[in-house]
């Protein structure tokens, strides 16, 4: 498994979860052989009530996917994180993505205690998540090194925005997943061996093939740069709606689709799909 898709949570016009669209999203990943990651920032986890997460997890579990299923753990307190993990691990899931706690900005020792406590209660593999732009603090490489030998420490997702941390994480001996679609070739050279992708929501097979070939392609870079112009998941939802993959592009407060200002470039981005497909195919033919 080289690609794990950070899946959107599709909504209806009344902002309730669109379960039919959710099935379509995860089935498309299953068809491509990509892992499924629910309840991350792309999935608007913080805008989902506990009962809604329960309903979505219950629903996806009934689909009996034949690809790995991961869940996000977004919490400000250790009690909240542990409560979610203890509940969710009763379902047929394959692991959790766990960032540093939100807002509190713990240091080296605080992070170590945070992850040690989570590893002590989890019965499923844990992927530590470095995302300082979301949490306010970077994951310390020393924390990763100290936890690397734990049997349930599966690896690190690195969304730190540079290759430096990726190199240090990889030197700890854990598997590193690149958390930035646009940085995959550079991160691969720095030790990453997989991609947690947003773009694969809309192009699952192309993302899989792009990661396998591991080379810089302008059409991919252009699309990633366009997605980064707006806060995630505004761009990916707009792109999926334009391709008729979901009926509604709406996001929940405090996000608003009215903040999406890049609609005039959608036609160019949609054209990137054919260009990317042709480039990937040309390598396969050679």
Curated annotation (Swiss-Prot):
Entry keyword set: Amino-acid biosynthesis, Cytoplasm, Diaminopimelate biosynthesis, Lyase, Lysine biosynthesis, Schiff base
PROSITE patterns for this protein: DHDPS_1 (PS00665), DHDPS_2 (PS00666)
Enzyme class, UniProt record, top EC level: lyase
One Pfam family hit: DHDPS
Biological process (GO), any one: diaminopimelate biosynthetic process
Gene Ontology molecular-function annotations: 4-hydroxy-tetrahydrodipicolinate synthase activity
Presence of the UniProt keyword Translocase in the record: no
Subcellular localization(s) per the UniProt record: Cytoplasm
EC id: 4.3.3.7
Active-site residues, as the UniProt record annotates them: 129, 157
Site (Part of a proton relay during catalysis): 41, 103
Pathway in which the depicted protein is active: Amino-acid biosynthesis; L-lysine biosynthesis via DAP pathway; (S)-tetrahydrodipicolinate from L-aspartate: step 3/4
Stored InterPro entries: Aldolase_TIM, DapA, DapA-like, Schiff_base-form_aldolases_AS, Schiff_base-form_aldolases_CS
Binding site for pyruvate: 42, 196
Catalytic reactions of this protein: L-aspartate 4-semialdehyde + pyruvate = (2S,4S)-4-hydroxy-2,3,4,5-tetrahydrodipicolinate + H2O + H(+)
PANTHER family tied to this protein: 4-HYDROXY-2-OXOGLUTARATE ALDOLASE, MITOCHONDRIAL (PTHR12128:SF66), DIHYDRODIPICOLINATE SYNTHASE (PTHR12128)
Self-association and partners: Homotetramer; dimer of dimers.
Family: Belongs to the DapA family.
Name under which the protein is recorded: 4-hydroxy-tetrahydrodipicolinate synthase
Source organism (scientific name): Chlamydia muridarum (strain MoPn / Nigg)
Gene name in the database record: dapA
């Amino acid at each position: 498994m080289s690609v794990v898709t950070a899946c959107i949570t599709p909504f209806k016009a009344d902002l309730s979860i669109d379960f039919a669209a959710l099935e379509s999203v995860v089935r498309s990943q299953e068809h491509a052989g990509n892992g499924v990651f629910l309840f991350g920032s792309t999935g608007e986890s913080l805008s989902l009530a506990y009962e809604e997460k329960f309903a979505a997890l219950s629903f996806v579990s009934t689909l009996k996917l034949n690809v790995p299923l991961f869940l996000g753990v977004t919490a400000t307190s250790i009690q909240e994180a542990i409560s979610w993990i203890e509940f969710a691990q009763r379902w047929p899931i394959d692991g959790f993505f766990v960032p540093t706690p939100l807002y509190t900005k713990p240091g080296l020792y605080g992070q170590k205690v945070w992850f040690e406590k989570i590893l002590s209660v989890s019965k499923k593999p844990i992927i530590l998540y470095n995302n300082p732009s979301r949490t306010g603090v970077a994951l310390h490489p020393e924390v990763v090194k100290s936890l690397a030998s734990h049997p349930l420490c599966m690896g690190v997702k690195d969304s730190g925005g540079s290759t430096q941390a990726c190199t240090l994480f990889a030197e700890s001996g854990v598997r590193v997943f690149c958390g930035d679609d646009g940085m995959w070739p550079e991160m691969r050279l720095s030790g990453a061996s997989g991609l947690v992708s947003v773009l694969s929501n809309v192009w699952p097979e192309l993302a899989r093939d792009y990661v396998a070939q591991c080379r810089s392609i302008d059409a991919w870079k252009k699309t990633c740069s366009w997605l980064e112009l707006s806060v995630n998941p505004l761009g990916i939802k707009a792109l999926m709606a334009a391709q008729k993959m979901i009926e509604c592009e709406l996001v929940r407060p405090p996000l608003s689709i009215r903040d999406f200002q890049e609609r005039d470039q959608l036609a160019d981005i949609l054209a990137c799909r054919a260009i990317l497909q042709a480039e990937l195919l040309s390598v396969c033919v050679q």
